[in-house]
Amino acid sequence: MSKRTRQYLGLLSAVLAYYIIHEGAHLIYALITGTFKQINIMGLGMQIDIHAERMTDIQLGIFCLVGSIATFITAYILVLLVNKIGDTPSKIFKACMYYITIAMLLIDPVYLSVLCGFFGGGDMNGISLLFPELAIRIVYGIILAINIAVFVKIILPKYQLAFSK
């Protein structure tokens, strides 16, 4: 299989994994709190719709926060497993895990520190019910800086070595 095909499969797997983990966390919380309404498919994306009127502000804030917590935890599990992933013989698997790791490390911190101000609040609207928006943006900006450093110092070199084998 060509390198380009592996890259496309890796990118597709990252998008799917992100939606499963991030939106899955929202779904689980909505089901636990009895506020699940429906799953909305929008273009290439999806969103968990809830009965927000049945939630307290704290519950709504937690609902909006759990997606990024789930991707954060997943990202660092993948960071911890980078050596084992790199030792697998399958270049397709390594490509998929590489792009999934990038997605888990970067998407939510980029969105919640910078992009939410340009593209609508999304999860920020709910999280800001728990904490001031500026504080959230600063915290996610710090997480983003740390995650970029982890990517540059750990993930990128390990995968470069793994793909050279």
What feature does the model see in each segment?
Residues 48-162:
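Metalloprotease/metallohydrolase-associated module, dominated by Zn2+-dependent proteases
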Residues 1-12, 31, 72-76, 80:
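Active-site scaffold of zinc-dependent metalloenzymes
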Residues 10-60:
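Small-residue-rich helix-interface/hinge motifs
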Residues 2-20, 90-99:
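Alpha-helical transmembrane segments and their helix-start/interface "positive-inside/aromatic belt" motifs
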